């Protein structure tokens, strides 16, 4: 059975596969981030959102995986076999867990549409030959700026690429003024 854990969120395993494995923080850092930002919602008996539920399930899955790893470490006599199991878990399962945690934390932090836009932007950037692409990859934390603009101007067509840093800087004072007017309403 081929199950894509991102499908119901509008993404795919392939879309996340464009991000290199060293892009994702460690599981420990991601768990600390999830706890710091969303502990109350994650521990709540009430349903918050599908991303909270997926995050809970991923955290529980990681806990079970660590229980299994501990059992293997304590019960597998052959050091070579034990190392093979540990390396497989760290390389394959660890990466999948890091991807899931990153995706759902990012969706809760920046919004699903922004994360999907980032994944598409990064996928286009990474597949463009180096001679024809900007030197720096898109940055997720800069995309909410364009998302805010898009939400205010619903009649406009959505942006298809991340603006250049020079363009972003020149627009930010104007954006700040319009945001302050909105907050006064």
Curated annotation (Swiss-Prot):
Residues 157-179 are annotated as: 3 X 8 AA repeats of S-P-R-R-R-[PR]-S-Q. One of its GO terms (biological process) is viral penetration into host nucleus. The modification Phosphoserine is found at residues 157, 164, 172. Keywords: Capsid protein, Cytoplasmic inwards viral transport, DNA-binding, Host cytoplasm, Host-virus interaction, Microtubular inwards viral transport, Phosphoprotein, Repeat, RNA-binding, T=4 icosahedral capsid protein, Viral penetration into host nucleus, Virion, Virus entry into host cell. Pfam families: Hepatitis_core (PF00906). It is found in: Virion; Host cytoplasm. The keyword Hydrolase does not apply. GO terms for molecular function: DNA binding; RNA binding; structural molecule activity. Signal peptide: none annotated. Sequence repeats lie at residues 157-163, 164-171, 172-179. Residues 149-178 have a biased composition (Basic residues). The keyword DNA-binding applies. Residues 136-185 are annotated as: Disordered. Gene3D superfamilies: Viral capsid, core domain supefamily, Hepatitis B virus (1.10.4090.10). Phosphorylated by host SRPK1, SRPK2, and maybe protein kinase C or GAPDH. Phosphorylation is critical for pregenomic RNA packaging. Protein kinase C phosphorylation is stimulated by HBx protein and may play a role in transport of the viral genome to the nucleus at the late step during the viral replication cycle. GO terms for cellular component: host cell; host cell cytoplasm; T=4 icosahedral viral capsid. InterPro entries: Hepatitis_core, Viral_capsid_core_dom_sf_HBV. A motif (Bipartite nuclear localization signal) lies at residues 160-177. HAMAP family: HBV_HBEAG. Belongs to the orthohepadnavirus core antigen family. Self assembles to form an icosahedral capsid. Most capsids appear to be large particles with an icosahedral symmetry of T=4 and consist of 240 copies of capsid protein, though a fraction forms smaller T=3 particles consisting of 180 capsid proteins. Entering capsids are transported along microtubules to the nucleus. Phosphorylation of the capsid is thought to induce exposure of nuclear localization signal in the C-terminal portion of the capsid protein that allows binding to the nuclear pore complex via the importin (karyopherin-) alpha and beta. Homodimerizes, then multimerizes. Interacts with cytosol exposed regions of viral L glycoprotein present in the reticulum-to-Golgi compartment. Interacts with human FLNB. Phosphorylated form interacts with host importin alpha; this interaction depends on the exposure of the NLS, which itself depends upon genome maturation and/or phosphorylation of the capsid protein. Interacts with host NUP153. This is Capsid protein. The gene is C.
